[in-house]
């Protein structure tokens, strides 16, 4: 692995998905990532634009598939066989109090959404369709990787935000729009800092084909070795 990290990117074909720079991306993020791409070009990488047309459908599919898996996996969390427990006079109260106390708001939200998506009458309408979208997204990545070795793109359409600045679930979900397709497709990815906006970091993600984790790390490590963003520690609220 260490040998792989030091091989650089000269001659590698790096794809840039045009859909990851669509309307809604912060202009500062766009500039930072474009500068990172130029750094790769200067290091000998071959840069080419690619298309992942189903990117816009990934968010909706993910927030059906992920809550469904959450609901299914956490159904066993009862405080008896799994997890912490709050003892109560009755078994039912033990279940209810344990799950209420130890599940956070977002977990509860996902359990409810997932239970709904998997319920009778809605499985085909939601979960099955979401899995079909997932398959399409995975196939698009497979097709793109026939022409490039790896992808480079923004990690998020916005820079990191201050803790507590956002509490609305929808706006939080939208911050994941550029990493969710990678998760749905089951691909290795790594994020590295590529700039700061008002003291808050901007992320660059590297995406590689399945089982090519070493390649993703190699491309990311090459960028870190050529820049100093990863070594900066800007005080919050102070422009870097």
Predicted features, each with a name:
Residues 51-59:
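Short, surface-exposed recognition loops and adjoining beta-strand edges that mediate ligand/DNA contacts
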Residues 46-51, 190:
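General small-molecule cofactor/ligand-binding pocket signal
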Residues 25-29, 61, 165-167:
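Short, solvent-exposed loop/turn segments at secondary-structure boundaries
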Residues 58-60, 164, 201:
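Short Asp/Glu-rich motifs
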Residues 59-73:
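Charged, often glycine-rich, active-site loop that binds/positions anionic groups
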Residues 64-68, 169-171, 207-209:
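Short, hinge-like loop/turn segments at secondary-structure boundaries
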Residues 9, 20-22, 54-55, 76-184, ...:
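Serine-dependent amide/ester hydrolase catalytic core
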Residues 1-26, 30-43, 108-139, 184-240:
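Structural helix-boundary/capping segments
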